[in-house]
């Protein structure tokens, strides 16, 4: 199978300045995603033709990626029209696919995007997403989710006409009775290349999708300095106490 791994990170960031090129527990944040790729290639990728690209307009991020010799990465400079706040990431991944096909003179069977700001991901999570996409070729994308701690039928509310009410009106009296919901954690996406080319980006995730479930720590987003500090506390515990997370940290830390 021909797999294209994409890493996408722009220079600008509203919440945490330059977060894509920052250190996380004294290791460059992007190296955790690269460690996932390296471990996948070592453990499961012997029969696959795997390429990796970085799509960015950040020179510091380019330099960090170039320092890792274990994972050869082709750098795609992000065009200005794809670097704005309102540009959907799917458009950037499509740009990566088109330019990778030109650079490597081949078509890919799957595009796997690993979010740079998701360091709490294991190689097994990556394998699960790729395997699910292989098992279900009819779906257009398999993405990662985590169990939701709140449920719109039971304990989520909205403001309406000056009052608060349940997000979805219901007669459920316990959370266990309500339909199960998941958080899209934006960590892993395994795409069909044809869907990237042909599906409307603004409604891409409204239909024909499947998901793999990750540990619920994977719902943390780095959108503020407080998020950044809190995630490092949680990550330190996981890297020290859980083997599947520890191997990712060990691999990333070995490149220092």
Residue map of PLM features:
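N-terminal nucleotide-binding beta1-loop-alpha1 segment
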Residues: 1-17
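Short active-site oxyanion
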Residues: 48-53, 217-218
